[in-house]
């Protein structure tokens, strides 16, 4: 009796699983991602929530289903129809076997399938879980099953790993300090579904750049409950901030009081141009010479108490006397020689170098930015010194190009401080530093991002970069763009991308799959026949990738099979929404 009851429950749970799959197929055109082994779990959840049948399914599928009432009605109808269909097939099969006395499958001569006149044909396409590795066809295992992603599963956000989303109702997190790349157009959930949750769940120090005020406003109070929070917003783009906090000042002159420091900060300011030249040697020449000119100017200003406004004036007016006098008083021959080499160039060449240097410090020509450089409260060494402090850099969208050298220099300083501390202690930062570079191609484009991504983990830096599409990466880094992409261990591709470069590249990464095409023929005399053919096609064609439903993403992670996952908008998660709302409950 108990065995019969168990079998009945299993049969009912399987019918409910089948009905859910048919319903998602009807509403989205795709089969559900819930494994059949979880069918009993669906039955238990339905019993626990009889009035809210949607709660039985994971969020990824729940969003694709109709309302609770419609879902319940459809489940009842489809479950009943499934039961009737299975009963009819079982009866029909037993009836045919009784009448023929032979198995239902019949093969013709040579192993080919036979088909009688007036026969009915049914076709089914089934994906095979074996790869293809012949010719130019890449080996592919198809979409990941839950068991394939077991090493990435976590029961809750760890605090030192980036939660990527959910798969089959389970959280997936990147391995510790493995770099994450997020690609998607505006409104695809990059910020709300990954960047903000990552910041709210991180327990160590943080550096975040963004053009969106909501990233700061949603995380500021919670991060303040963990440690000191600073934000750099020289143009006041984020508006009033909770708690009446004021923006912190930053000046490159704070690091230019020594000649090595001046050379370093000049290199950081000019690096954004090197990142954007796409490998053009001519542009590299002019920016290298602009860096050589800027270093002694910054050193002269820092050692005489001058300001960045003075540096801008020296460049605009091609001032030489003040600069040379300051450098002579500083008593560093190398700095004086560098200045004289730049100032003594042929007139047309010198004019071009000055013009290039002017574009690098153009942001400080803005009175608001210049005023914010009168003080320097941002201390990169303190940020990576073991606390859970936070530094937000907020760039207005309309000023990205002009302010990019400033933001890049700040990010470069923090990364240098992190790498130096790791080298001094002989071990990675503990706790690790989270660096979130939103709009990584334009706000703070690091010239050596490919190397930073490759080495950050070993120094205790968790890197998250956010992009509109891969065309941005290609435009910014030229021939190195594929290396930038490949050095990220985790790559998340969000919905709505229309860029051909992104679609083709990701489709190629996912590879191809084998599909078995089955055809069944049922003759008038009750005889059955079957044929099978194997076809190879792209696992995720570009058109399919473009039509990913909102809130979903494709995860490409190391050597794991690719997976379709659901993002976690912070406002849909109770714990994250609570942290974003108050930041008071730890």
Where are the regions that the model predicts?
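P-loop NTPase motor domains
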Residues: 11-15, 19-20, 24, 171, ...
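Short, solvent-exposed helix-helix connector turns and helix-capping sites enriched
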Residues: 49-53, 63-65, 258, 319, ...
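A residue-identity detector for tryptophan
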Residues: 14-17, 31, 57, 74, ...
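Short alpha-helix boundary/capping motifs
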Residues: 46-48, 52, 385, 484, ...
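Solvent-exposed, charged interface segments at domain starts and junctions
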Residues: 138-170, 289-316, 481-483, 490
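Short alpha-helical interface patches
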Residues: 109-157, 258-269, 311-314, 380, ...
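Conserved ATP-driven motor cores of ASCE-family P-loop NTPases powering translocation/secretion/packaging/pilus
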Residues: 453-557
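Basic- and hydrophobic-enriched, low-structure N-terminal and domain-boundary segments
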Residues: 1-12, 17-188, 192-195, 238-242, ...
